[in-house]
């Protein structure tokens, strides 16, 4: 049995880590990738993700292939899941009680026992609103009041989510400060990284038109506002670094082979299914090269 979530201080050594970008509903691509990796029996030592990357990555740790797309198909159109109704009635675009309590404990149970028994370490990226910096928290469990609070904080999108307090510190979506936690994985001692991005090649993030709203909403947290203002620049640099690492053979990269037109808050299940199917297809296509890379770098 593992203990309560703790913020990472030491740097343990890992042979292979999965680095998972977020992207809200767009991240269902990652679920498709992970389901194929599980079908091929891929073994990793750690998973580190941001936002939706963690939402789907936890199912890799618990060994629950197919769970993400299953509950998306069942509940995405439920007004308590995500959207305007949830925002107006709870103050958050993602229904906290429905998504983080009812689904994992009752409607489509998360296998907590398998997660805790797994040898795979699971890190959630969060942004400290006070410092504006990313923190990568090791979650030994995803229990209510424990690791589940960290998971929720890491996927709490600014402007449409409440700040989550953990250990007296305020947190929001990890994507604000560290959308692609590749460097964090290396700093944690990960020798080889398999990185999953959710945007196709050539995508460049541009400064948000909502920056004035961020500045007004979080005026008490100037460091957070500054980090948000630099987000596009930071993201583009991170992707460039991962691309260079993939070219050198140090890292293996899987990303969408095309743009399905999916949005962050997508409701159309055909589009969501297409994004998931693309993740599966891209990973099946990449598997021969990935298997060779794993053997060559092992």
Predicted ranges, named:
Residues 1-50, 58-298:
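Patatin-like phospholipase
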């Amino acid at each position: 049995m593992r203990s309560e979530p703790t913020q990472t201080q030491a740097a343990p050594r890992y042979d292979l880590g999965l680095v998972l970008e977020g992207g809200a509903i767009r991240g269902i691509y990652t679920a498709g990738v992970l389901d194929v990796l599980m079908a091929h029996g891929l073994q990793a030592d750690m998973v580190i993700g941001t936002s939706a990357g963690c939402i789907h990555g936890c199912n890799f740790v618990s060994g629950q292939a197919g769970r993400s797309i299953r509950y998306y198909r069942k509940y995405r159109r439920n007004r308590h899941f995500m959207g305007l109704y949830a925002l107006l009635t709870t103050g958050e675009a993602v229904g906290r009680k429905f998504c983080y309590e009812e689904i994992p404990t009752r409607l489509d149970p998360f296998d907590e026992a398998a997660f805790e028994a797994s040898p795979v370490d699971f890190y959630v990226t969060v942004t400290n609103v006070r410092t504006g910096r990313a923190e990568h928290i090791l979650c030994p469990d995803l229990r209510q009041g424990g690791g589940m609070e960290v998971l929720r904080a890491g996927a709490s999108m600014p402007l449409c989510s409440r700040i989550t307090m953990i250990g007296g510190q305020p947190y929001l979506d990890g994507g604000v400060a560290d959308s692609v936690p590749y460097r964090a994985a290396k700093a944690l001692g990960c020798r080889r990284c398999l990185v999953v991005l959710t945007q196709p090649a050539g995508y460049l993030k541009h400064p948000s038109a909502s920056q004035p709203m961020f500045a007004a909403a979080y005026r008490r947290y100037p460091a957070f506002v500054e980090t948000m203002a630099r987000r596009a620049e930071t993201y583009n640099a991170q992707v460039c670094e991962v691309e260079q690492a993939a070219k050198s053979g140090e890292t293996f990269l899987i990303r969408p082979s095309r743009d399905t037109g999916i949005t962050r808050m997508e409701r159309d299940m055909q589009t969501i299914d297409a994004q998931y199917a693309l993740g599966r297809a891209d990973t099946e296509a990449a598997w021969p090269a990935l298997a060779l890379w794993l053997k060559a770098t092992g």
